[in-house]
Regions:
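Signal-transmission/dimerization alpha-helices at domain junctions
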Residues: 1-6, 102-106, 174-196
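Signal-transmission linkers at sensory-effector interfaces
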Residues: 1-34, 45, 65-66, 189-204
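Regulatory loop-to-helix N-cap segments in sensory/regulatory domains
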Residues: 3, 133, 148-150, 156-179
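The cytosolic transmitter module of two-component sensor histidine kinases
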Residues: 28-32, 36, 93, 169-172
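GAF sensory/regulatory domain recognition
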Residues: 41, 53-92, 105-107, 114-115, ...
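Signal-transducing coupling segments at domain and membrane junctions
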Residues: 105, 110-136, 158-167
Length: 204
């Protein structure tokens, strides 16, 4: 397991162009649900991974907001619809996403089946039921510019050009965290605008 907080990166020109385009899109998207879906899909695209889950931090817990697995054609919550039968994740040290949120740290695990630091009984149970195989994992806490926790992005099973599952390259960690921070600012701004509109309506 690697827990990282800072590292220099040297993206290729193509990757840099993609990142800049994503940044522009993040700054112009005004629909909250579309923005959240774009965060998840951008993270998957940049890291070339098969699956991802986006959690939002509300009421002291991490709530499932969006889940997507390409190889199984699974897409839930993308249009803002609630994800049923998925209880909130409590903030405990043994849960990898909760740990990342509590300590505001990036967590990069090459193979969850070799890791004993965190409790992966949930993913292992899912694998046993569905035939999926969770292997590599990258967890990024999402904070706004006031260091408020907005949520957590969990990316699963990075793949090489042949489709083989590989560990997540460390160079993507800061890229994803930076995009997450920008997205968090936009989410906070949208929340502020909605609150102002609500207050204005209360005076009418």
């Amino acid at each position: 397991m690697r827990i990282r907080t800072e590292e220099k990166i040297k993206p290729t020109n193509a990757e840099l162009k993609k990142i800049l385009n994503i940044g522009i899109k993040l700054s112009t998207e005004k629909n909250r649900d579309h923005l959240l879906a774009f965060i998840l899909e951008s993270g998957m695209d940049i890291t070339h991974c098969d699956a991802s889950t986006l959690y939002l931090f509300e009421d002291g817990k991490l709530h499932f907001k969006i889940m997507k697995t390409l190889s199984q054609n699974i897409s839930r919550g993308v249009e803002g619809e609630p994800i049923d039968n998925m209880p909130p994740v409590p903030m405990t040290e043994r849960n990898v996403c909760s740990y990342a949120a509590l300590h505001r740290e990036i967590i990069n695990i090459p193979d969850v089946y070799d890791n004993t630091r965190f409790d992966f009984s949930g993913p292992k149970k899912y694998d046993a039921l569905t035939g999926y195989h969770t292997q590599s994992l990258l967890v990024i806490p999402i904070e706004n510019n006031e260091e408020e926790l907005i949520g957590v992005l969990q990316l699963l099973n990075a793949m090489d050009e042949t489709g083989k599952v590989i560990p997540f390259d460390a160079e993507y960690e800061i890229i994803i965290r930076s995009l997450g921070a920008q997205a968090a600012i936009e989410i906070t701004n949208l929340k502020y605008v909605q609150e102002v509109k609500r207050q204005l309506r209360s005076f009418v």
